[in-house]
Amino acid sequence: MDKKMFCFQCEQTVGCTGCTGNAGACGKKADTARLQDELTGALISLARAVDGSTAISKRTGQIIIEGLFTTVTNVNFDDVSIENMIQKVRAEKERLVPDCSKCQSPCGKTDEYDMQQLWDANEDIRSLKSLILFGIRGMAAYAYHANVLNYEDAEVNRFFCEALFMIGYGESVETLLPTVLKVGEINLKCMALLDKANTETYGIPEPTDVTLTIEKGPFIVVTGHDLRDLQLLLEQTEGKGINIYTHGEMLPAHAYPFLKKFSHLKGNFGTAWQNQQKEFDHLPAPILYTTNCLMPPKSSYADRVFTTEMVAFPGAVHIDEKKDFTPVIEKALELGGYKEDQILTGINGGTKVTTGFGHAAILSHAGTVVEAVKSGAIRHFFLVAGCDGAKPGRNYYTEFVKQTPSDSIVLTLACGKFRFNDLELGEIGGLPRLMDMGQCNDAYGAIQVAVALADAFGCSVNELPLSFVLSWYEQKAVCILLTLLHLGIKNIRLGPSLPAFLSPNILNFLVENYGIAPITTPEEDIKALLNHSK
């Protein structure tokens, strides 16, 4: 069969083998996929041009981060935008090694890496390189969000080059495997950097109830992950009679004190990303996409889709780095919003959700938690976290949370929580049984809680009554998984399906060394996880 493209970086890839037709499962066209490969090849060549430098300039680092972020699933569907990014990468390489373009001798500095070499490689080499590539793509998103708040880490920037070089020129399992785990190590630093950036800029998240009711009148829906974009929009809409509602991974913004002070930040609209084409259908308001996940818009709302930062879609109005949101504001006033209040619900019928249980909030009750564990009031902790998606089988996570014992605590983060975050699970000792820790990058906070509990009980994280039940969809989930592996976390349950880019040998390595297992049924997995912790 003639392959029009090849991509297997997301959980929904066709047949759990790879998208090869005229378009991917995510909606990107084959031409777009080929441009993403060309961009990745250019980035590998730029990393080669850096040639082991210990001091990556801020400019070079930012270009690499932007290029990697552009290739994350559901970020950029616009070929012109990607072509411009490719030229930006090539221009930076020319700036670093200007004589290379004049040289007639082929070498790694003059030739761009052809991604077909990776896709055609030995399956174990391809698997390890894919883990590195998809991991640093996810990590680039976190680095980007930190950078826009003027936080950066030279070690993180330097590692992007190191990892890209290994993708292009690493030749053995023995050399690639340490880099896979180092992605997890550096991603931990990157998530810590973003946690610092967010909390020092917007304050420590506080437990906060968020309504799902949409008030009548003009409003704007903000989706994605970028808190700075939300801040700027709130500032530009203040006093204009326009309400702002979060969507998807922007929900945790309600917990930050700086953002909470805006009275027109009203609540949350809708559920997770994969439901947007239904939920945004004929929406009487504009939608601002700050990051993934963007799905190709339906005609019923395409005229009210606005993108910014690295997000782009053909025909959508893009808000550039000047951050003048006037077109979005004018569209909100033109559409006018709903004529009456709309009482919406979560997937399970709840009319509100709660967020803001970051690591600081939970650890402020550390004494209560430790005593509850010692007394037997809390028997187990479940971290049920990760991405949501459209693939059948994800209702597993709803049923899993529903069936967790009444003497257990459920921690959650990322958009997978929309499967169950409107459930009322009650309390233990004044603490809610279900605690939303934030966005996917707030996995850093979950790690801090786990480490603090292990210290309190004088044991390792693996010896805690704590189980990781994860869902994945895109590349940020990959870098988080690699961070957990770097920390030695074992017996993770992963679903709804295992990554197509894991070869049998590499998967077997993860099973034998880390006990990774696919999800089965909620009943069987809960029983097995509780028995394992005894």
Give a label for each model feature.
Residues 43-201:
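Electropositive, gly/pro-rich neighborhoods at or near active sites that engage anionic ligands
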